[in-house]
Amino acid sequence: MLPYDTGKFHGIPVGADSISARHCKMCKYIGGKTMKSSNIPEVKLGIVAVSRDCFPIALSEKRRAAISAACAAKGTDLYECKTTVENEHDMQKAVAEVTAAGCNALTVFLGNFGPETPETLIAKHFDGPCMFVAAAEGDGDMINGRGDAYCGMLNCSYNLGMRHLKGYIPEYPVG
């Protein structure tokens, strides 16, 4: 008799050939004890900042670092991708970086306007859910008076739709 074929499925008597007995083998019912499992996925969240090349990249990087610091202060585990996306090459590098870090969910953060093609292609090339959010323009945190993240969010939304890509955009994505 195999260890998983105990005649009981989580304490309920069953036949040796029943689906429940076979299920015990799959859920690691070993030696009369069930290993605790959960159907809630373990999320390793990453954040990637994007910046249009005609805008100051430092603004996106500074805002991304502030979000990472705020998450760390609240005890939220967040991987901060050091590659800021301005073009398709940067997009591929950033996706490879977050994938190598083990991220399975991603926040694409528009620290300023953002490049529509590379930022939306992140959703295509990253193997996991992507949420798109943007920094508020009126937060006073601008470089040379530039911080057009709201307009970039509108373009991002439009381009995701045009490319038939799925990305999560919260009800209030700018803030």
What are the functions of these language-model segments?
Residues T6-G7:
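Intrinsic disorder/low-complexity segments
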Residues S18-G175:
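An N-terminal assembly and electron-transfer interface module characteristic of large anaerobic redox
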